[in-house]
């Protein structure tokens, strides 16, 4: 087992200069002297093709274990070979296409961020009297004790809402009341946030195209002498806000990470967020620049194939040259920090590159980074850990963080039909606040649907996967689909002495020819919903991890896309109902199901409730209904103290007409509801309790088209009230009378990916807030 080496970085200190190699965009040399004329209409490169130039490289599989690189040269060589091979496969595919039209490493870098001028905010010192789960509902998290990032958060006294480009903070002096405290502009497109006491971390997507040309960040992200090409297309920004006074949030830190935000979790004051970076390479080309005359040739003309082959070979040579001129620092992600009006750039490699690792048999050009933030650290220090790999899926329990990824990228399968889909599993110990420690890797056959297909329970990792799901389109007989549940535990590899995940049990051949649509692990059970034409619910016993077994199965029409355990005896699910013939799916129908699993060997359905946002569901003008809760569990809000479920439901229609003068007019009519459902385990029934309606926020004289922003996005139960949140307003409804208690209309500022943004210096702690005057939160005396 290898030892990970910590590299210390000081974000405020001097950084060693890294020379960036400037490259122009390489083009194919289709010029006179380099080309042989075939006829007046088309030219092809005058190139002699080597006999083995298009040989397919045989892929070998060994282990998903994360292995260190011996030095920077080995890391650079491996990365460049992977990038080159991926581009080569894409070019080879272009040869085959007759109609083709061209056009982390693992390092534990403990980083202490420099203090801003006014220092950091202190940790909360008092316990809130309002308790989540008893007095109010929070985010619908997968695991107890693990908070998931979302764009709506509450501490029971305030509601925090990322609305468009703004952070909006509301006060809740008493349940049933609502006051606007502040509105703060956030750079980029804010997508999620994490809350702990008086610190709020807002995560936003910043497009490189939106960065103002006067911002020094634009110079850092651009390639010298290459117009219009950026190192990466997007940044993940962390805006750390001191919200001691909710009326005037102050910016404490600003960090920019190259790459896309995946997700974030908070456990005991420590935030761990995962990003995926994919660096643009100047001069790298994965398409063919076909000459204009090519398209004038007959479709079956063999000259077409010759042109594609020779252009492909020339492009491969050009790619090799482009990569040879790049330095290692050019293909690794960077971190940027704004400090006292100065932008500081941080590279993540050290002199030996001994911290960087990748799976033993699966190199890639992507970087999965785990950033660990300790909110109780006055200087907001963090670890930056990196793995070379594919896009990750993330799961977390209170003690473990799990990243799963496709073991091999798509291009590995080209010319290697015998390889089967597999998923790498990388585990990390997060039991100590502020630390994330790698504990081993494993692999299962098939692909993992989402975070609910993974669970850690009493030291046992459980995985649900479907094999043969992504049938390869070039194969005549791809392997049929089948699902499995696998159990793994930590162990030691006898040959390498490394910590690994060892498979100890499995159950196979679940629902042949079907794939998993939803999964949920609860204690020593697993619940699966598979689907092809009907919806089987499977109950799997995991009490003996060495011998998992199917206990029961129930087949019903339709499908469930999210499973919510109510108790040991009941499951509540949401999904779609069946088609008219009882088979397939009616995508316009949102359906709730209450399953009775008190006898796990014979599960049954207690009740089914179909939901519609309009009074007359047979009115063909309304052709569909939509609920975000059918695919996003955070929109599904079940409140156990009252046995109530809140589900957003919406639709719209387009109306047009001509007036008496022949003038054409049109309008959009919206229905935006939150349906409250009574759920009784005792009687095994469900019924409509009432509806919260936000339609009036969106139906106005201007007939504005709101895109997908007219939906009620989230809901919060507080005492005897429910708070419904949408882009144009927040309402408070009494659950007893279903009458509106109060409401606040909002102005939604549309997110814009490519709009330039000017960033003001935040070194002294600033905000662009408006709302109530500078005064404490109305509930501050209660803390």
Describe the function of each predicted region.
Residues 2-14:
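Short, Lys/Arg-enriched N-terminal segments with co-localized hydrophobic residues
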Residues 13-16, 772:
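Short, low-complexity interaction segments enriched in Ser/Thr/Pro/Gly
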Residues 18-24:
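Sec-dependent signal peptide recognition
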Residues 26-33:
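Hydrophobic core
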Residues 34-783:
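Beta-sheet-rich non-transmembrane sensory/scaffold domains
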């Amino acid at each position: 087992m290898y030892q990970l080496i910590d590299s210390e970085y000081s974000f405020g200190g001097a950084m060693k200069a890294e020379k960036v190699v400037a490259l122009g965009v390489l083009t194919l040399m289709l010029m006179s002297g380099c080309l042989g004329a075939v006829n007046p209409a088309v030219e092809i490169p005058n190139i002699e093709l080597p006999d083995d130039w298009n040989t397919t490289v045989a892929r070998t599989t060994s282990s998903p274990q994360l292995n260190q690189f011996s030095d920077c040269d080995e890391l650079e060589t491996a990365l460049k070979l992977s990038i080159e091979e991926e581009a080569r496969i894409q070019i080879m595919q272009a040869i085959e296409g007759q109609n083709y039209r061209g056009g982390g490493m693992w390092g534990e870098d403990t980083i202490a961020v420099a203090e801003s001028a006014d220092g950091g905010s202190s940790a909360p010192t008092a316990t809130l009297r309002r308790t989540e789960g008893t007095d109010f509902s929070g985010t619908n998290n997968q695991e107890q004790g693990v908070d998931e990032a979302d764009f709506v958060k509450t501490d029971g006294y305030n509601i925090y809402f990322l609305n468009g480009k703004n952070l909006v903070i509301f006060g809740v002096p008493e349940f049933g009341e609502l006051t606007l405290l502040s509105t703060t502009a956030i750079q980029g497109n804010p997508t999620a946030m994490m809350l702990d006491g008086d610190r709020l971390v807002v995560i936003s997507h910043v497009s490189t195209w939106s960065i103002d040309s006067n911002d020094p960040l634009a110079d850092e992200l651009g390639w010298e002498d290459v117009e219009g090409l950026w190192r990466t297309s997007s940044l993940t920004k962390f805006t750390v806000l001191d919200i001691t006074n909710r009326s005037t949030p102050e910016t404490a830190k600003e960090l920019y990470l190259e790459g896309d935000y995946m997700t974030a979790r908070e456990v005991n004051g420590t935030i761990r967020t995962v990003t995926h970076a994919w660096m643009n390479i100047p001069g790298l080309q994965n398409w063919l620049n076909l000459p204009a005359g090519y398209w004038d040739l007959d479709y079956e003309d063999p000259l077409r194939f010759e042109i594609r082959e020779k252009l492909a070979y020339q492009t491969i040579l050009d790619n090799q040259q482009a990569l040879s001129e790049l330095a290692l620092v050019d293909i690794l992600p960077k971190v940027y920090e704004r400090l006292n009006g100065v932008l500081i750039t941080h590279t993540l490699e050290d002199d030996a590159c001994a911290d960087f690792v990748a799976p033993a048999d699966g190199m890639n050009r992507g970087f999965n980074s785990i950033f660990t933030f300790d909110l109780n650290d006055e200087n907001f220090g963090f670890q930056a850990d990196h793995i070379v790999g594919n896009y990750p899926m993330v799961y977390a329990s209170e003690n473990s963080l799990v990243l799963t990824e496709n073991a091999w990228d798509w291009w590995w399968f080209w010319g290697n039909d015998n390889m089967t889909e597999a998923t790498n599993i990388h585990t990390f110990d997060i039991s100590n606040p502020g630390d994330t420690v790698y504990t081993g890797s494993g692999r299962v056959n098939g692909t993992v649907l989402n975070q609910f297909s993974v669970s850690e329970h009493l030291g046992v990792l459980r995985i649900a996967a479907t094999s043969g799901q992504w049938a390869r389109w070039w194969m005549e007989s791809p392997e049929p689909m089948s699902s499995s549940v696998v159990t793994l535990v930590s162990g030691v590899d006898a040959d390498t002495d490394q910590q690994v995940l060892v498979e100890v049990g499995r159950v196979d051949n679940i629902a042949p020819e079907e794939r998993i649509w939803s999964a949920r692990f609860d204690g020593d059970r697993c619940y699966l919903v598979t689907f092809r034409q009907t919806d089987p619910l499977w109950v799997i016993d995991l009490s003996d991890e060495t011998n998992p077994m199917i206990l029961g199965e129930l087949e019903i029409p339709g499908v469930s896309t999210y499973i919510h355990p109510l108790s040991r005896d009941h499951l509540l699910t949401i999904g779609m109902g069946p088609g008219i013939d009882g088979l397939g799916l009616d995508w316009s129908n949102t359906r709730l199901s209450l399953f009775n699993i008190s006898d796990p060997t014979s599960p049954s359905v207690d009740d089914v409730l179909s939901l519609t946002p309009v009074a007359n569901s047979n009115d063909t003008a309304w052709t569909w209904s939509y609920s975000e809760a059918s695919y996003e569990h955070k929109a599904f809000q079940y409140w156990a103290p009252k046995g109530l479920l809140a589900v957003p439901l919406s639709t719209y229609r387009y109306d047009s007409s001509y007036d008496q003068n022949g003038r054409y007019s049109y309008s959009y009519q919206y229905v935006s509801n939150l349906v409250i459902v009574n759920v009784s385990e005792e009687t095994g029934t469900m019924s409509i309790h009432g509806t919260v309606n936000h339609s009036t926020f969106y139906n106005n004289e201007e007939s504005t088209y709101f895109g997908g922003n007219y939906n009620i996005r989230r809901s919060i139960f507080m005492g005897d009230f429910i708070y419904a949140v949408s882009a144009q307003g927040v309402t408070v409804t009494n659950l007893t009378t279903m009458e509106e208690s109060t409401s606040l209309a909002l102005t939604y500022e549309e997110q814009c990916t490519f709009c330039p943004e000017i960033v003001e210096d935040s070194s002294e702690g600033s905000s662009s807030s408006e709302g109530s005057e500078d005064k404490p939160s109305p509930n501050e005396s209660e803390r």
